[in-house]
């Protein structure tokens, strides 16, 4: 019995609204034409997405690329027909979005280190060092260090760009730095750590085109150029030399692709000057990236934005195909080589080479030496 045709609308909605897996919504829409019309008309895919990730309530409109929907006519039609097309478009987009959030592989989500609130010795102690898993490169320590403060309450923050406009973040891990070259081997952790997720403001400069982007300190630019749509609780950080994982209470959809790590409360002074510092050797972010499927566009002052669909291919299958082709490995290798080059430059800043100037002989000296050689028996 087709209960959609035999039951009243409210009862059918109550039954289908119990589905909490996007795959089940897709299967329901494939049962029959009447079921699909019901699922689309009452936006069941969209409602499930909003139920799972409330941040999506700010989606203002869906944008589809012409290549993906070239079968649809762009000509104007009746109001009813246009409404149906809009609902169909929303159904496709939100069904794909829900599937990606549930089935895309969990991976590292940091694309770049953007800015630190302060840096003690730039660029040797730059935020860029936190992209490296190791706490030393050869014999050279690798870490970010804040400037020193006499008060323990002065906070610090690190800003990162994620690998896509839409990332479902599940966990952030931080490795405080232990200064093995200082007496007592102090660990410069913080009391607490907190995370913010969000996007750039419309009128903010894009750091990708800025000459001072690569890790230079600038707290005011962080505060004025970004909007944070999610703020986590404060997590306690141990003063221990290990990678410490902080799992969010529930996965959070980052809209805009930026993560701010805030360090609250200083615990360790440096013996040399008696000031409090915070030092970090590595930051890692894990989650599901939807960069191959979606892009965020036209974020307004109220946080409303357009959700652009880049491809309707299954996100999980796209990742598997990329892995087989080695594209991800090549990209990761390129990033690794770039970071190694930056580490080398930092090493040269820290340990300048002693270059001995070579004095080239004058041409007259060469001629004199040749004449002496000819004169010898």
Swiss-Prot record:
Which organism's genome codes for this protein?
A: Arabidopsis thaliana
Q: What is this protein called?
A: F-box protein At4g00755
Q: Which SUPFAM superfamilies does its entry note?
A: F-box domain (SSF81383)
Which Gene3D superfamilies does the record match to this protein? 1.20.1280.50
What Pfam families would the database entry show? F-box-like
Q: Where is the F-box domain?
A: 7-47
């Amino acid at each position: 019995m087709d209960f959609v045709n035999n039951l009243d609308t409210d009862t059918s909605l109550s039954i289908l609204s119990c589905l909490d897996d996007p795959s089940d919504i897709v299967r329901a829409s494939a049962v029959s034409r009447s079921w699909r019309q019901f699922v689309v008309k009452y936006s069941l895919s969209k409602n499930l997405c909003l139920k799972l990730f409330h941040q999506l309530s700010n989606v203002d409109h869906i944008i589809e690329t012409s290549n993906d929907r070239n079968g649809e006519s762009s000509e104007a039609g009746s109001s009813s027909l246009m409404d149906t097309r809009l609902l169909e478009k929303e159904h496709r987009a939100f069904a794909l979005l829900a599937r990606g959030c549930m089935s895309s592989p969990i991976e590292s989500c940091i694309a770049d280190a953007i800015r630190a609130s302060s840096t003690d010795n730039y660029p040797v102690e730059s935020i860029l060092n936190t992209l490296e898993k190791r706490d030393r490169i050869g014999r050279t320590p690798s870490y970010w260090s804040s400037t020193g403060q006499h008060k323990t309450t002065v906070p610090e923050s690190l800003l990162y760009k994620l690998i896509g406009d839409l990332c479902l973040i599940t966990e952030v891990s931080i490795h405080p730095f232990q200064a093995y070259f200082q007496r007592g081997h102090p660990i410069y952790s913080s009391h607490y750590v907190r995370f913010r997720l969000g996007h750039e403001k419309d009128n903010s400069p894009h750091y990708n085109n800025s000459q001072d982007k690569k890790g230079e300190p600038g707290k005011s630019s962080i505060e004025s150029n970004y909007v944070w749509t999610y703020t986590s609780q404060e997590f306690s950080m141990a003063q221990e030399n290990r990678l410490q994982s902080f799992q969010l209470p529930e996965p959070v959809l980052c809209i805009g692709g930026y993560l701010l790590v805030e360090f609250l409360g200083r615990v360790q002074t440096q013996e040399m000057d008696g000031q409090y510092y915070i030092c970090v050797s590595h930051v890692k972010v894990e989650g599901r990236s939807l960069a191959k499927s979606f892009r965020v566009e036209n974020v307004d002052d109220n946080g409303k934005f357009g959700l652009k669909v880049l491809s309707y291919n299954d996100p999980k299958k796209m990742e598997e195909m990329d892995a087989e082709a080695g594209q991800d490995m090549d990209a990761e290798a390129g990033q690794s080589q770039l970071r190694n080059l930056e580490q080398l430059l930092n090493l040269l800043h820290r340990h300048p080479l002693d270059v001995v100037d070579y004095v080239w002989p004058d041409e007259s000296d060469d001629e004199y030496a040749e004449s002496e050689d000819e004169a010898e028996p």
